[in-house]
């Protein structure tokens, strides 16, 4: 019998924030970006999720040599803190050139900008000795369907994947699907779409998925089933665990904060599939409540990590013989009651 997985956790520096939202300004003092890395180990985290401009600020204004210099400096910072860069993601949704999309923009000049920015992100990942690029295809979609040729858009996405795989012969690409926001309807809305693109690529073994709980919920799907699908194909590069209270804007609530049973099932699928045993991180993408005072605010991170580990113990202490008995008898009423009682800690 294999030994239990010793999970490692990651988050991005943006998860320590000032609490601004579309309806109001900051409510907390800013905590300096460069000081956030010193918090990770104290909070129980070993991995750092990075946007390209988290790693190298203002990179569009820098030369390749300057980008390399800045990335190398961050590599030293992370090493000194005992941290591992989990991935680098090109932040392709802020620039004026990406208003109408990035790789699927109708403008050839805008597509060229997106490709140039992507190459810079890969260069940063190389400098950090980071093995993965995450593609959140944020603005790849439309507000009205007639705005783009969808077939051509998907062809362009596949061509971009192949170009990335050719640009770096070892980098992995993890596609992070989301069905909406900031576009009305996005291309590659689910992990099934992402894995289909992976298999169509020139080196599918290096193309995987990153599943965020809230994104799956926003697609009307169960996050644990999405994870199971990716795991069955050997294509779950990472996860962004959080929660979502209904079909609305992306909330990034604390993991388990809206649906504890759904959180349990995500942990169950990951644990039973051996996720993490090959070094994969358990990534969190959670926002502190706007009402939370302090600087820096980090309880949402430690609370979500703690809840994950509590649910791991719930999975490991399930009576598997009883579960098998209920399954064999097709007595799912009894199975459900057992699961609910187990989660509540009552007999």
Where are these regions (language model features)?
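Substrate-binding cleft and catalytic face of glycoside hydrolase catalytic domains
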Residues: 81-100, 133-144, 179-182, 186
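Histidine-acidic metal/acid-base catalytic patches
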Residues: 2-46, 119, 123-126, 131, ...
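Glycine-rich, aromatic-flanked loop segments that form ligand/cofactor-binding clefts
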Residues: 4-12, 71-95, 124-126
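Surface-exposed, active-site-proximal loop segments in enzymatic domains
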Residues: 19-25, 54-69, 94-112, 137-151, ...
């Amino acid at each position: 019998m294999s030994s239990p997985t010793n999970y490692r956790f990651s988050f991005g520096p943006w998860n320590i924030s000032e609490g601004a939202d579309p309806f109001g300004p900051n409510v907390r003092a800013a905590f300096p970006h460069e000081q956030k890395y010193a918090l990770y180990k104290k909070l129980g985290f070993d991995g750092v999720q990075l946007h390209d401009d988290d790693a190298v600020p203002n990179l569009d204004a820098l030369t390749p040599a300057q980008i390399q210099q800045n990335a190398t400096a961050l590599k030293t910072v992370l090493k000194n803190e005992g941290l591992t860069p989990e991935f680098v993601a090109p932040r392709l949704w802020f620039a004026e050139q990406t208003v109408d999309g990035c790789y699927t923009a109708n403008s050839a000049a805008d597509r060229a900008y997106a490709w140039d920015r992507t190459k810079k992100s890969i260069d940063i990942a190389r400098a950090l000795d980071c093995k993965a690029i995450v593609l959140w295809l944020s603005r790849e979609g439309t507000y009205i369907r007639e705005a783009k040729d969808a077939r051509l858009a998907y062809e362009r996405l596949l061509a971009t994947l192949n170009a990335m795989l050719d640009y770096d012969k070892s980098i992995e690409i993890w596609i992070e699907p989301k069905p909406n926001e900031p576009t009305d309807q996005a291309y590659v809305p689910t992990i099934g779409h992402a894995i289909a693109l992976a298999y169509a690529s020139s080196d599918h073994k290096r193309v995987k998925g990153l599943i965020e709980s809230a994104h799956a919920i926003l697609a009307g799907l169960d996050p644990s089933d999405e994870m199971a699908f990716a795991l069955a194909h050997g294509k779950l590069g990472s996860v962004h665990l959080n929660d979502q209270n209904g079909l609305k804007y992306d909330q990034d609530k604390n993991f388990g904060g809206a649906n504890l049973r759904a959180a349990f099932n995500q942990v169950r699928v990951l644990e039973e599939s051996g996720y993490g045993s090959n070094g994969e991180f358990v990534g969190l993408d959670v926002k502190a409540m706007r009402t939370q005072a302090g600087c820096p605010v980090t309880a949402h991170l430690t609370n979500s990590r703690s809840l994950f580990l509590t649910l791991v113990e719930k999975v490991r202490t399930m009576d598997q013989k009883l579960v098998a008995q209920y399954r064999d008898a097709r007595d799912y009423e009894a199975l459900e009651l057992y699961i609910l009682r187990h989660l509540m800690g009552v007999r």
